[in-house]
Design a protein with these regions (language model features):
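Extended intrinsically disordered terminal tails
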Residues: 1-188
Length: 188
């Protein structure tokens, strides 16, 4: 499981996240996927989650299982409440996002190589999950900070950390060169 220790659902539920996309990214670290299911049976509407184990490439393996077979705390209603709780917590404590943002920005300044970026972030306790189009373009970037137990879509941290900014950063013509250190004259 991506080099992570054995986990329990309690470990995942400690993380703060504000959207289904952020929750998906967190689950992917533990080789778990999620499908949202909605429908109607006998005139009664239902809404829930179905979880599946995945292999290292994100392909489902084995049979999916309903959230209700695990625990109420991982069902659709509980997770949606978690989104609202997390949004409130992030609004009240801006430090959570600032810690992650500053760490990611510092690492981004060190390299134009995506693999090196991922490696340096991991050393700081942050995982990044990139989502790619069929032709390899980055269309999503989510940062999972294990230090603050917070999950953020890149655009939530700032325009400079959005998927488009990441795509541009990692495909610039000078991607194989070392970044030029920023120097500010002393008289400023």
């Amino acid at each position: 499981m991506n080099g992570y220790p054995r986990f329990g659902w309690v470990d995942i539920l400690r993380f703060q996240h504000q959207s289904l996309g952020e929750y998906h990214a967190l689950l992917s670290l533990y080789n778990i996927s999620l499908e949202e299911v909605r429908g109607e049976v006998g005139g009664r509407e239902y809404h829930g989650f179905v979880y599946s184990a995945t292999d290292g490439q994100g392909n489902k393996v084995g049979n999916p299982f309903k959230a209700s077979k695990i625990d109420r705390s991982v069902g659709a209603e509980a997770i949606e409440k978690r989104f609202a709780y997390s949004a409130k917590k992030f609004k009240e404590d801006k430090k959570l996002s600032e810690i992650t943002k500053h760490s990611v920005e510092a690492v981004l300044k060190q390299t134009y190589h995506k693999d090196k970026f991922i490696e340096l972030l991991k050393a700081k306790g942050i995982d990044v999950v990139f989502r790619h189009t069929a032709d390899g373009r980055i269309y999503g970037a989510t940062f999972i900070d294990h230090r603050t137990q917070s999950v953020f879509n890149g655009s939530r941290l700032g325009k400079n950390l959005s998927a488009n900014a990441m795509q541009e950063h990692f495909t610039l013509p000078y991607e194989n060169e070392q970044p030029i250190p920023l120097t500010i004259p002393e008289e400023y």
